Curated annotation (Swiss-Prot):
Keywords: Auxin signaling pathway, Disulfide bond, Endoplasmic reticulum, Glycoprotein, Metal-binding, Receptor, Signal, Zinc. PROSITE patterns: ER_TARGET. Its main location: endoplasmic reticulum. The gene is T92. InterPro entries: Auxin-bd, RmlC-like_jellyroll, RmlC_Cupin_sf. Residues 1-20 form the signal peptide. One of its GO terms (cellular component) is endoplasmic reticulum lumen. This is Auxin-binding protein T92. Pfam families: Auxin_BP (PF02041). Disulfide bonds join 22-177. Glycans are attached at residue 117.
Length: 187
């Protein structure tokens, strides 16, 4: 009997280890995104799930996120050396964007209203911020980035010099797994 329990515990432990959230081992090929856990990574008002990613899933060219912003939540003012595409699933908000330029700081951003079924892209190194300006409803987006994992430069405000922006790498949702994942840059 004790031997059966030990075998059962060993099988359970192996299956759990194989399905680690820092690995694709044990994950089904087809998954329901509404059943994937979302976390806020210490950022109240944000729920994030990496649907397919570099650090978590071994993706090399793109990364896909599902993000939900509570009313009033906003991303930091930031830029990154990758392209980014958003698809708004629900809610409304505002995109603030300053095109990449040769000035020393971002300057006054352009404002764009975003809404369900709208899409927008952020060019490489354009400083931007997404804000749920709705009062009642969450803003939910699918977010696709190129060249993962993302290296984010954050600004305190729109007048902060580019050279003073603070690098955040690995980013919040990559921190735990980035340390445990060996990165190979070949096919």
């Amino acid at each position: 009997m004790a031997r059966h329990i030990i075998i059962l515990v060993a099988v359970f432990w192996f299956a759990t280890a194989e399905a680690s959230h820092c690995s694709i081992n044990g994950l089904p090929l087809v998954r329901n995104i509404s059943e994937l856990p979302q976390e806020n990574y210490g950022r109240s008002g944000l729920s994030h799930t990496t649907i397919a990613g570099s650090v978590l899933h071994g993706m090399k060219e793109i990364e896909v996120w599902l993000q939900t912003f509570a009313p009033g939540f906003r991303t930091p003012i930031h830029r990154h050396s990758c392209e980014e595409i958003f698809i708004v699933l629900k809610g409304q908000g505002t995109l603030y964007l300053t095109p990449s330029s040769h000035s020393k700081y971002p300057g006054n951003p352009q404002e764009f209203h975003i809404f369900p079924n709208s899409t927008f892209h952020i060019p490489v190194n354009d400083v931007h911020q997404v804000w749920n300006t709705g009062e009642q409803e969450d803003l939910q987006v699918l977010d696709v980035i190129s060249r993962p994992p993302v290296k984010v430069f954050m600004y305190d405000d729109w007048s902060m010099p580019h050279t003073a922006a603070k690098l955040k790498f690995p980013y919040y949702w990559d921190e735990e797994c980035y340390q445990t994942t060996s990165r190979k840059d070949e096919l």
